[in-house]
Amino acid sequence: GFHMTIDDWNEGIEGELDDMFAAGITSFKMYLTYPAMMIGDGAVYSALKALKKRGGIAGVHCENAGVIDARIAELKAAGRAADVSAHPEARPDYLEAEAVARLLRIAEAADAPVVIVHLTNREALDEVAFARARGQRVYVETCPQYLALDDGVYYDANWSMAARYVCAPPIRAEENQRALWRGLR
């Protein structure tokens, strides 16, 4: 299916949802990171409410953009801009978990179901369990790289090999991989 991105929110965009739904597009993607694509918490709340009213749903990429940007600036200042091992340092698992928890509280306030995309770690998965225990409808998507690989891929001495694994959120430590497999059961 098609997933349209919501990267801004206003009355005009809300009105466009009706056209999208008429065309059969009922799932949308939003980002809590990437400055060119992310929308603020209030916009996420409004979009979730509008989607719920129409029977739609949003998948949300959860990372804490502000702190990640600050960490990237620190790593660049330390001369590590081209260091692949700096990638997971800039985007630690707890910043993903914080964004997941924040999204879930926003979805709770909107009384709307939500999909968390690219979930990578145990702490974020725990936040999902807490939300489900509160009665929320939460769906989770992970990816093969998070189930099959661990963060050791970023420390390959061959830079071009290590760089192949740069993705966001990053591949995590092995204990997170095990938690994801348990979550699939």
Name the predicted role of every residue range.
Residues 6-11:
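Active-site beta->alpha loop and helix N-cap motifs at the rims of alpha/beta catalytic domains
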Residues 12-185:
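Histidine/acidic residue-rich metal-binding segments in metalloenzymes
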Residues 1-2:
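A glycine-rich helix N-cap at a beta->alpha junction
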